[in-house]
Amino acid sequence: MRHGIAGRKFNRTTSHRLAMFSNMANALIKHEQIKTTLPKAKDLRPIVERLITLGKKGGLANKRLAYAELRDHDMVEKLFTTLAERYKGRPGGYTRVLKAGFRYGDAAPMGVIELVDRDPEAKGQDSGPVEIKDESEEG
């Protein structure tokens, strides 16, 4: 019997699951809102809440713990500066999970996980290739 066993496996190996949640946490910190399946969003929530709490505490040791999870210096800096400042007065509950219907292909329940009091400008930043127009070719 599987009584008292917490967490889901998502049909992935341990390393794949850890990498997936690391990537999803990076995306959530960067864009402040992501759409994924509802079970993944529910399992991502405590990971991100813990990271934001580390950012609020500050300090080198906590920065190293956050980097071990995120593996991205820019996101760790955002966590320890922007997000730590934004949530300094909030004692937890930094994220919300909203239901977002069902996926077309397999009817999987979808959800949106977002940071509370998020910055709407952060959504979609640095996504995809950037087209640079050369001024010398226009004339």
Curated annotation (Swiss-Prot):
InterPro entries in UniProt: Ribosomal_bL17, Ribosomal_bL17_CS, Ribosomal_bL17_sf
A Gene Ontology BP annotation from the UniProt entry: translation
Family annotation (Pfam families): Ribosomal_L17
Positions of region (Disordered): 117-139
Signal peptide bounds: none
Keywords: Ribonucleoprotein, Ribosomal protein
GO molecular function: structural constituent of ribosome
GO terms for cellular component: cytosolic large ribosomal subunit
Subunit annotation: Part of the 50S ribosomal subunit. Contacts protein L32.
Family classification: Belongs to the bacterial ribosomal protein bL17 family.
Designated name of the protein: Large ribosomal subunit protein bL17
Species name: Rhodospirillum centenum (strain ATCC 51521 / SW)
Lineage: Bacteria, Pseudomonadati, Pseudomonadota, Alphaproteobacteria, Rhodospirillales
